[in-house]
Each structure stands twice: as C-alpha cells, then as structure tokens.
Amino acid sequence: MFGADGRPAIGTAAGKSWHFSRTMEELVHDLVSALEESSEQARGGFAETGEHSRNLSCPLKRQARKRRGRKRRSYNVHHPWETGHCLSEGSDSSLEEPSKDYREKHSNNKKDRSDSDDQMLVAKRRPSSNLSSSVRGKRLLWHESDFAVDSLGNRTLRRRRKVKRMAVDLPQDVSSKRTMTQLPEGCRDQDMDNDRASQYPEFTRKKVKKRKLKGIRPGPKTQEEGGVLESEERSQPNKDRMEYEEQKASDELRSESDTSSLSSTDAGLFTNDEGRQGDDEQSDWFYEKESGGACGIAGVVPWWEKDEPAELDTNLPDPVFESILSGSFPLMSHPGRGGFQARLSRLHGTPSKNIKKSSGAPPSMLSAPGPGSNKRMVHFSPDAHRHDHWFSPGARTEHGQHQLLRDNRAERGHKKSCSLKTASRQTSMHLGSLCTGDIKRRRKAAPLPGPTAAGIVGENAQPILESNIGNRMLQSMGWTPGSGLGRDGRGIAEPVQAVQRPKGLGLGFPLPKSSPTSPAPTSGNPA
C-alpha cells in the first residue's frame, strides 16, 4: 500500500512506471471478476463476496441459494469485487493524486473495458452507466480486501436504505454549522468536485466498510475515525442528489424490505453510514444542548429542566379533598350529608344526641316529631363521660338500670316503638355497638344457674303430676303409676340419676352414696 513517503516519487519515471504496472494488474483482476459477476448475474444475481467469486464452485452454490427465493440486489453502483473502499484514510488520501493522473490518461481505455459493467447496471440505474469508468481508478490492491469487506457489503447498504427513510432532518443552523466546520478538511479534494455526483455512493460504501473494519481488526483508530468523518463531510452536500437517487431506487427498496431484517442482527458492528447520519447528528445536537430539546425534539423543554416549580409542588389546597375532610359536600343531598356526618361523628366518638342535632335529619325520617320522642332520645343517648364509666366495675348497677329502662320503654306499644326505632335508627345502632361488649362481660361474670354443691341432680324434685302430657301418654299405653316401665312393669321405676361434682374436681372425685328419699313414683325426667 502506498505511504506518505511515496508521494515525491510519483513524478519520476520509475514511480510512474511502477504505479502503472501495479494499476494494470488491478485492472486485470477487475476485468476477470467483472466477467465472472456478469455471467453470474445472468444466471441468478450478484455475488455476495469478491474473494469467493474467484472459485468455480461458489457460483453454483450461490445460484442454488438464489433459487430458494432470496433476491439479492446491490443498492450501490460499486459491487462486492470493488474492494478499494475499505482502506484507511491515510492510504486513501495518499493515492488520490496518482489515481487522478491515471484517470486522466486512461479514461478512454477504461471506458472500453468497462462495457460489461455498464451492461450489468443499465437495467437498474440507467444514468449511472458510466460511473464505473470514472471511479475504477480509485481502487487499490487486491490484497487489501479481507473477509469483512466481502461479507458485509450488501447487508450494510440494505440497512442504510431502511434507516435512511426513518432519519430525522437536522435543524438548518446545526447543519450549516457542521458544514462550515467540515469545509477545511475537504479542501484538498476540490479538484474532484466534478466527479462527486457519480462518486457519492463510493464515499458512503467506503465509510461503511471502514467502520466495520474498525470494529473487527485492532489498529490505529485515529486515522480511521478521521476517514469516516471526512466521508460523512463529503457526502453531506450531496443530500439532494441522494434523495433523487433514492426515488429512482424505490422499487429496489420494496423488494429488499423483507430481507433488511437479516442485517439488523449483526452483533458488534456499528454502521455509522449516510443513512443514519441524521440520527447521529440529532443525538450530538441533543447532547450539546444547543436548542434545549427533549429527546431530540426541538422546542420541547423537559420537565426536569424547567425553572418554575411544577403544579404538584405548589401545595395548593384541593377543594375536593378539603370537602371530604370537613364533610361538606355541596353536590350531595341533605339526607346523604346528614348520614355522612353521623358516621363521621360516630367514628370520632361524638354523642348521638349531638349527632342528631347537628345533622338535621329530614322530616320524612321523623314519623312522630313530638316532645315524647325527644324525651326518649334524651334517655337513650348517653353522653361521652357516662359511656366511659360503663365499662368500669363500679357502674354495673347503673348500666343494668339503663338496660331495663330501654327494654320497658320498647314494650309500651307497637306504634310508639316503631316510631321510636325509626327516629333513632342511628342511635340504636350506636347503642348496640357500645353495649355488646359489656353485656358479654356481665354474662360471663354471672354465676351459673343450678346447685353449686355436689350431689344428684334433681334429688329433691317433685313427682310429675298426672295432668302432665307425658304421664297421660304412658298411662294410655298401659303403664300404671308406681310400677316399672314396660308391658309387665319390669322396667325402670326411677329416672336416670345425674351426679354433679364440685367445680374444679375431675373424674377422680368420689361420687356421693345417697339413696332417694321417696320410692319415686315418677316416670319422666325431673324438671
């Protein structure tokens, strides 16, 4: 590959002859590969790799693969056998002058030799049939092309076209600023401005391959990055030409839309090509924060960068929440408002009398609005401190008296009790919830009914009277009082005895041995 020190020797005769011989060898290789690819295109399409196209068995394999339905088309004028676009920027810039001289000398000869390429491209892009003759002199040696260039050419171009359709246009000030900063680097190529209309796909392809080789082989990255930037800068002014070419290749975009997903799974390869140039500049513009955009959208300031406080941070009182806390619902009906206030006051422990006075129940709920009803309400509505004393041990008697008073007043009449229950429905529910626990405690503390001493249950019980229904039933079946049960009187004459042990003693306590005082003329169970 040519280095920077080879430039002074270009003007000499030895340098020119050596350069001419090397370039002729390249041209021979190019013609051979072009003939192979043109014959293969007539059978099934372009070859995927330039290195495999030299073998005779590879075209047969590729033709068999094309028959399965995968349609391969190249978006670019340059084909996979044109491998000079993968070189670094240092080698590329060092060969621009001899390549230009060679193009000026042998332009007619190369036009004659590139007829096969022109015939191969006339079906797809008719105006670019003479592009191969003007660009072929820029290619370099065959040993520069490696596997990355040969295998990744068409995939990246397909992906470039698809992402290009989704690219976001840059603002005018940002694009103009980047263009002004890019002009000094491209001044050395001003003599090639006439060929840019036909050579912009070459720069795009060169940029893709250089970026892919950068991710694969470890080498000096500064020159490669510079080369990529320069390629982007060269292709920036040709945006209108690219859009024109893209409209002409719209049918190719439709045919390749199904195969574009194959290139999206290439791991570890970042294709910063012309199609994604708008996205890259957009992200740079957002990173530089020139217009203050949010997520790449101009004119939208994100909420975390706003100077004024947000609405959530002002701590303004919410009228709905305040109305819920205070219990004042302007849209609620009067009965619903009173019921809510009653439940709220009951939760806070407010007496029921105050509840009724503050809530203002409607007249429809008071069926008997008289002094008697109000009197009953006062009697059945204990105040807060009395409620606190209910559960104290010294107030059992007072609580029992209140309980009896409520029971007696409830039994005075059906109508009056119904009106009382209707008027004091909330009060009754409140009293019931308060008295339930105390009643359970009182029942648990009361002594159990029955004899507390040990002995036989019902030992001193009176005999069953003859008017008892059980006694008369047994006599109707043939039983006579004083005899045993059964037809012959041989059954039991006394009821089954039940012995009660003292409290706290289990089964080991000895049973009392006592006999009944009377001959037990009874036949039924003791009462």
Swiss-Prot record:
Its main location: nucleus. Residues 62-76, 206-215 have a biased composition (Basic residues). The modification Phosphoserine is found at S114, S116, S145. GO terms for molecular function: nucleic acid binding. Residues 510-527 have a biased composition (Low complexity). The keyword Transcription does not apply. Pfam families: G-patch (PF01585). Residues 466-512 form the G-patch domain. Residues 35-135, 175-281, 350-375, 480-527 are annotated as: Disordered. Keywords: Nucleus, Phosphoprotein. It comes from the Eukaryota. It is found in: Nucleus speckle; Nucleus, Nucleolus. Residues 97-116, 186-196, 231-257 have a biased composition (Basic and acidic residues). One of its GO terms (cellular component) is nuclear speck. Interacts with DHX15. Enhances the ATPase activity of DHX15 in vitro. This is G patch domain-containing protein 2. The lineage of its organism: Eukaryota, Metazoa, Chordata, Craniata, Vertebrata. The gene is Gpatch2.
